[in-house]
């Protein structure tokens, strides 16, 4: 374990001890405020100086405002002086992370947070949204509970990061890929099946479906068009939830590492996890083609037991619509 990792491991232990002490505070608002401040102080130590932490209201250019946020990270360098003089209101474009901190996560607190982050998204907010809780009221899967409360869980969830101390750290990732990466033109031509209204064009030349395999035309990556669509530009997204579950400081270290890696030019977050080697699982998967069609939506609270090599797809196209659909290969 590196010195940096050891020091932050000790800071996290201290944070948890302070949380236990704060339990004796009777006033819920003060108790929650203490926990928020101590957690935000820890976060402030792993972000570059150009970023600042504040508590207040996020506003967009239309004057629409968010609910009061526990705290957020914003880019101080892009703000003009007249805005810096009143940081009670921060432009949505400047936000880089938005946090909600809970002492005990329950169903009500979860739904309230989802609602807050939904309003932030409506303002045009695109920064990662984080729900961190020091404890929880359930023994079961935190991610599964969240899945059941957010209709957009698989694709565009209101929470991008869910972290419960001594239990689990989960984050949502999306990758954009091109069909040509997994199916070169040569393979497409070999396996394509004729469909009604399927029009092909190679460069400026229209070609019949039946003559496609016999043509002597040179077909490169950007010359083939299917019903007016450039084959090389057909793309799709892979939505996945990753996470690590552990009853220890590895949960907070993973969260801090992720924040640091996102905001720093270099991946300094790896220092926080040095010697830890957390085992991350994929808990959900979902594919979305460039026309918004969703397929192969799956979730397992224990982690999915297959990988991308176990996925197959079909592509169909006509004058009205196009679909690139994925599914798990049958055994």
Pin down the residues of each PLM region.
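Intrinsically disordered, low-complexity Ser/Thr/Pro/Gly-rich regulatory segments
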Residues: 1-68, 73-331
């Amino acid at each position: 374990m590196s010195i940096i990792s050891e020091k932050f491991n000790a800071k996290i232990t201290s944070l948890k001890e302070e949380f236990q002490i704060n339990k004796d505070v009777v006033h819920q608002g003060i108790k929650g405020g203490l926990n928020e401040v101590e957690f935000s102080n820890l976060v402030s130590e792993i972000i570059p100086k150009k970023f600042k932490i504040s508590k207040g209201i996020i506003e967009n250019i239309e004057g629409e405002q968010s609910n009061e946020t526990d705290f957020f990270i914003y880019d101080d360098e892009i703000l003009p002086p007249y805005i810096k003089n009143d940081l009670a209101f921060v432009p949505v474009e400047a936000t880089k992370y938005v946090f909600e901190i809970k002492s005990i996560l329950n169903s009500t607190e979860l739904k309230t947070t989802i609602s807050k982050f939904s309003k932030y998204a409506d303002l045009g907010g695109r920064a990662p949204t984080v729900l961190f809780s020091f404890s929880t009221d359930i023994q079961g899967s935190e991610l599964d509970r969240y899945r059941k409360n957010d209709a957009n869980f698989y694709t565009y969830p209101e929470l991008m990061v869910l972290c419960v101390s001594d239990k689990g750290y989960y984050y949502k990732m999306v990758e954009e890929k091109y069909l040509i990466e997994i199916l070169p033109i040569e393979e497409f031509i070999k396996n394509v099946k004729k469909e009604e209204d399927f029009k092909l064009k190679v460069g400026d030349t229209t070609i019949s479906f039946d003559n496609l395999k016999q043509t002597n035309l040179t077909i490169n990556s950007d010359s083939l068009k299917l019903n007016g669509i450039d084959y090389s530009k057909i793309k799709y997204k892979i939505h996945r939830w990753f996470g690590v579950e552990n009853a220890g400081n590895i949960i907070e270290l993973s969260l801090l590492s992720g924040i640091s890696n996102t905001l720093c030019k270099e991946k300094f977050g790896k220092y926080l996890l040095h010697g830890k080697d957390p085992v991350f699982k994929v808990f959900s998967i979902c594919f979305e083609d460039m026309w918004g069609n969703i397929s192969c939506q799956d979730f397992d609270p224990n982690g999915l037991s297959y990988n991308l090599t176990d996925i197959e797809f079909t592509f169909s196209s006509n004058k009205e619509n196009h679909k690139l659909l994925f599914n798990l290969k049958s055994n």
